[in-house]
């Protein structure tokens, strides 16, 4: 399926469009389309391009495929709604779809913890910590904090 992604930056007080960009591609390439749109907007706005180090960090902050991203975001939504049981199931599926995505493991650790399974929470927190190398410094701190917190409680 072909899709078109239109992104527009507007000055809301004046109602003027400052910059816009449109990219077209296949649904399977959605993440690449988002990256292309971001690059196009940066160029039009005169903002510096993303460095190779930043690009690695951005890619690490997202699951490697759409299905894993969907399941991860739905799992987070269930966690926020205090439905740890549904979150656990969705996050386990997200991990099956992308075993190397640190933040899915970290979120599953939170779900296990809320369900009272501290050993399972500890294992997922450890896994998240081991996979966190390419995350942004802020995300690394969150993952490390969760791991240290659950490790100290057990």
In which residue ranges do the predicted regions lie?
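Acidic, proline/glycine-rich low-complexity intrinsically disordered segments
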Residues: 1-154
